[in-house]
Amino acid sequence: MRILIADDEAIIRLGLKATLEAMGHEVVGVAADGLSAVELARTAHPDLVILDIKMPGIDGLEAAEAISRERPVPIVILTAYSSRDLVERAAGLPVHAYLVKPIRPVELGPALEIAISRFREEQALRQEAADLQEALRSRDIVQQAKRRLMEVHGLGEEEALRWLRARARRERRSMREVSEDVLKGLPPFDNTPSA
């Protein structure tokens, strides 16, 4: 896996890099501050990002938010602080795992796996929500076209729906595409649509 590391302590960066490489990962970027981490994420295209919370400039949580806004990836937060307010702040952001320093290699592997798993679940939910939104938009368009056929051609509701279905089958197009044509007045319909 291609991983980006950001920590303001050089010793932590070196140790983390060595541990990750020993685990078989490729470290594609190392940053000492949050802004550099955001820039590196832009150019290195990591599969996962590990960020320290306390860094100069923008902190790890701000960097996590900026990185996720541009190109969502799994994010693991490292910190020497386990204060409740930091944990709560991290929980409200696109953070997929949270580790308290000093990091032991035995903890790092599972944290990466959990982060990847949570990220995938999050992405699947986003896709499902987008698919549902698209289905609702399609349904609304079909409903509008059905009403148009009922008003313009005097069809009953079932008759208008049958007409849309038959046209979609005949033209090998989706009901939404046929409905969009009806709403645009394309193609010109004769005065007696028939199933």
Residue ranges and their predicted role:
Residues 1-12, 16-20:
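Conserved acidic segment of CheY-like receiver
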Residues 33-36, 58-62:
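Acidic catalytic/metal-coordinating carboxylates
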Residues 39, 61-72:
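Short amphipathic alpha-helix used as the core "switch/output" element in two-component signaling
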Residues 44-50:
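Active-site beta3 strand of CheY-like receiver
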Residues 52, 79:
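Active-site residues of response regulator receiver
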Residues 55:
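Receiver (REC) domain active-site loop signature in two-component systems and cognate sites
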Residues 62, 82-97:
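Alpha4 helix (beta4-alpha4-beta5 surface) of REC/receiver domains from two-component response regulators
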Residues 85, 103-112:
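C-terminal output helix
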